[in-house]
Design a protein with these regions (language model features):
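Glycine-rich phosphate/adenosyl-contacting loop at the front of the ribokinase-like
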Residues: 1-76, 115
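Glycine-rich phosphate/pyrophosphate-binding beta-alpha loops
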Residues: 89, 135-139, 294, 300-303
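Conserved phosphate-binding/catalytic region of the ribokinase-like
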Residues: 1-5, 152, 208-321
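Conserved N-terminal subdomain of the carbohydrate kinase-like
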Residues: 50-133, 314-321
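Active-site metal-binding loops of divalent metal-dependent hydrolases
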Residues: 12, 136, 165, 261
């Protein structure tokens, strides 16, 4: 029996989000622990799964704070490294009135992209049922090599491999490079989570179904999840397509972490039910739970520390049905 349900590799950083004005009229920023892979793991922990994180932070105040937050969430940090020369990565998040966001990164370099292949403990990855990664660790040669090593170890050990492109344009030298690296990620995965704007960018097709068909024909990915924000979500499993409406919240603050929460719920369903013989009813059940959980996180600042409990998600579903 494997030690972990899910191991994820990638960025662990501080999301600085706006939190009103000071008495002098200056913008105040709140330091929220973040990073997509750890957000995913935090939600999986809430759902009762055993998880571990592979990554790097700076050997500084913020890095040590992040390590503590991750450990407090129940996530194993045996393969979390500290860099003495480079600081923890920072992201400044500007939130618009509709809840959408714009990012400014302090990451040239940041500690997360200096995780080397030699620092990746293959034994932790091979001791997982599922391995999850995104594209932010593919933006730089050093962490790219670490990611490639981790994916190879996961595939060798028979792990389910899952990928979320999580495109952040400012972090890439060129969008052509981003396309090439995300192409590589899609060739590795059994489950892909992709957003509406990402599928349009990657395939050049405005119609989502046409874009998904291109991905299915090119990469033969068993299960593809499409998140569409306020339009809900879809799941594509071969010829089977399911769709679920969103749970619109009147008190939405921001959308940071919503996609990660959605992704975690999908991975939890896959761990519990496998990737065989999924039908429309099963996929719809999966999407409804994931949509509900994602909607709850939009009512809270940050993500990693405030993931919803299973009971909160089930209560929301019961109230809306």
């Amino acid at each position: 029996m494997k030690r972990f349900d899910v191991v994820a590799l990638g960025e662990l950083l501080i999301d600085f989000t706006q939190n009103g004005l000071s008495g002098q009229g200056n913008m105040m920023m709140e330091a929220n622990p973040g990073g997509a892979p750890c957000n995913v793991l935090a939600m999986l922990q809430k759902l009762g799964k055993k998880t571990a994180f592979v990554g790097k932070v700076g050997d500084d105040f913020l890095g040590k704070m992040l390590a503590g937050v991750v450990a407090d969430a129940g996530i194993n940090t045996d393969n979390l490294k500290f860099d003495r020369d480079v600081h923890t990565t920072l992201a400044f998040v500007h939130t618009y009135e509709d809840g959408d966001r714009d990012f400014s990164f302090y990451r040239n370099p940041g500690a997360d992209i200096l995780l080397s292949a030699d620092e990746v403990d293959e034994s932790i990855i091979k001791d997982a049922r599922l391995f999850h990664f995104g594209s932010l660790s593919l933006t730089y040669e050093v962490s790219r090599a670490a990611t490639q090593k981790a994916v190879a170890a996961a595939k060798e050990a028979g792990c389910i491999v899952t990928f979320d492109p999580n495109l952040r344009e400012p972090l890439w030298k060129t969008l052509d490079e981003a396309h090439d690296q995300i192409d590589w990620g899609m060739r590795q995965c059994d489950v892909l989570k992709i957003s509406d704007n990402e599928i349009q960018w990657f395939t050049g097709r405005e119609d989502f179904d046409e874009g998904i068909k291109i991905l299915q024909d090119t990469y033969n990915i068993p299960l593809i999840l499409l998140s569409m924000g306020r339009d809900g979500s879809r799941a594509y499993y071969g010829d089977v397509v399911a769709e679920a409406k969103p749970f619109i919240q009147e008190n939405t603050i921001e959308t940071t972490g919503a996609g990660d929460t959605f992704c975690a719920c999908v991975l939890n369903y896959v761990l519990d039910n496998g990737l065989e013989d999924l039908d429309t009813d099963k996929l719809t059940e999966m999407l409804v739970f994931a949509n509900a959980a994602a909607s709850i996180i939009t009512t809270r600042k940050g993500a990693l520390k405030v993931m919803p409990e299973r009971s909160e998600v089930e209560k929301l579903i019961a109230e809306r049905q």
